[in-house]
């Protein structure tokens, strides 16, 4: 029975997905076998190779093989089946090459199902070398020397350490891109919500420099005043030092002048502690130990203010 190329290629695709490299195709017969290629022989081409299987004489092929390979077309080669043992795997491959075969299919002499890639010297080796289990070898032997049985050698999909590293790297890169996208979208939503606040989000516009400079200042003397609530700047989290210039906001909260100037000049025109807008005329009682950190006034930006908007102020003491 003649098989069309479409049927054969379909079978090859199925076998590839099953990771079967040795496929026997004949009349009403399709068998696939797992194998492992030797490390010192040429690898099977991506398109696969087709041939006829013969049993080596002698079977161990530790001496010259007497049944020489028959010359066939370039589309069909001759393969030889050899049993493991008696000599090295490399020697068997070289004997098969000397006899004119294009591939040496060696099967285990024991019933060990573990297939280990065989090593050897690749110098002068031009044919394929494959190792299969003993059970596979016994089945292949029953179909050898039959012209109607085609043996296909198909490359498998091996997973190397580099492949694993590549997949891991791509996965991490994709996750990072997703997280970055979520962060950007969330930040855009917050900014859009701020713009939609009443009065256009008053309190988030930059304070004019002349208004900023008009706010009173004082030189810290080290004496804690009765109305003062802290000896630490709430922006830079540093204690006040004697002689430092402090700026006083209308809400009576004090900060390092350089800190609050940077804060109010970066489109954050509200007190870092009580969130009151220094430009409004709201009468707010002096701060005390019970003063809430977030003011309930309409100009409050509540939770929309993010921690990453705080300025970083570096003071250098000379």
Curated annotation (Swiss-Prot):
**Disulfide bond annotation, renumbered to this chain:** 62-87
Q: Which residues form the PA domain?
A: 70-143
- Protein name per its UniProtKB record: Receptor homology region, transmembrane domain- and RING domain-containing protein 5
* Taxonomic classification: Eukaryota, Viridiplantae, Streptophyta, Embryophyta, Tracheophyta
Residue ranges annotated as Lumenal topological domain:
22-163
In terms of superkingdom, the source organism counts as: Eukaryota
Q: Which gene encodes it?
A: RMR5
GO biological process terms, semicolon-separated: protein transport
Membrane topology (UniProt): Single-pass type I membrane protein
**Positions on the Cytoplasmic side per record topology:** 185-318
MF GO annotations: zinc ion binding
TM ranges: 164-184
Zinc fingers, RING-type class: 233-275
Organism the protein comes from: Arabidopsis thaliana (Mouse-ear cress)
